[in-house]
């Protein structure tokens, strides 16, 4: 019985440690998101679009440190934060509304985080759909 109880105690310690790591990862992701939003706020009209992409990228980098179902929630929060940063930029006159959601080359930025393969159960990952990809044929 002692062996059984000791095993359960060790398992509990492992769960607590994993929860603490997840909590730490979420806190880091939130900190990076805040950094990115402050970065966007300090940019001029020309830099705002690039700044919004930076927020998304920093958040995406930190999301990889967070495991399990938390990833889905962090990704949703990050996307809403990026959308909010863009709205703030438009409201303050840093950028025109028609410039939001495009990178410096004018290509749409939507789907940055949505296409990231995420499995809350950590069982399997699927690649994003290939609808947006084109076949590449090298020139002879």
From Swiss-Prot:
Pfam families: Synuclein
Disulfide bond entries: none
N-acetylmethionine modifications at: 1
Statement: the UniProt record of this protein carries the keyword Ubl conjugation: yes
Modification Phosphotyrosine occurs at: 125
Keyword Protein transport: no
Binding site for Cu cation: 2, 50
Positions annotated as Sequence repeat: 20-30, 31-41, 42-56, 57-67
InterPro entries referenced in this protein's UniProt entry, alphabetically: Synuclein, Synuclein_alpha
Alphabetized UniProt keyword annotations: Acetylation, Alzheimer disease, Amyloid, Cell projection, Copper, Cytoplasm, Disease variant, Membrane, Metal-binding, Neurodegeneration, Nucleus, Parkinson disease, Parkinsonism, Phosphoprotein, Repeat, Secreted, Synapse, Ubl conjugation
Protein name: Alpha-synuclein
Taxonomic path: Eukaryota, Metazoa, Chordata, Craniata, Vertebrata
Gene label: SNCA
């Amino acid at each position: 019985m002692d062996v059984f109880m000791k095993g359960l105690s060790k398992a509990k310690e492992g769960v607590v440690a994993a929860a603490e790591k997840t909590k730490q990862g979420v806190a880091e992701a939130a900190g990076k998101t805040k950094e990115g939003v402050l970065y966007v706020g300090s940019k001029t009209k020309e830099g705002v679009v690039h700044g919004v992409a930076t927020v998304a990228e920093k958040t995406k980098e930190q999301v990889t440190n967070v495991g399990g179902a938390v990833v889905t929630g962090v990704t949703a929060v990050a996307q809403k934060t990026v959308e909010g940063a863009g709205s703030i930029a438009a409201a303050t006159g840093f950028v025109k509304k028609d410039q939001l959601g495009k990178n410096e080359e004018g290509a749409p930025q939507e789907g940055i985080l949505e296409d990231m393969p995420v499995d809350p159960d950590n069982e399997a990952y699927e690649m994003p759909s290939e609808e947006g990809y084109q076949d590449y044929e090298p020139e002879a």
